[in-house]
């Protein structure tokens, strides 16, 4: 089986889930291995700082090609912003779609979609914890527990 990693390049500080937590990691890269449902935070020397199990979009096989396909994108992206008004705990927007994604969608005559994030659980549902890993439930985002984000 071909591994299709989803790679995010970032230099942002990944903040703890509560202000009182002392643990903070500075990651140079985040790699998501879709087929393994695994996300790794790497330092500038590509050493793994931390690894997480993740849930993906409800239709995770293959690259995202259009809006509404419930797929998680594959490619190189950046963390473009934090979304303080999100319905999900501490969401980080990624820079999907990039130029290549837009060109591929235009060639197919479809909208590429957007609003892809790395986030915790739905607000008010943090109690679910690792139970969210039982199935892929996002619309294309990458989900971890609230404690992990």
Residue ranges and their predicted role:
Residues 16-17:
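N-terminal signal peptide c-region/cleavage motif recognized by signal peptidases
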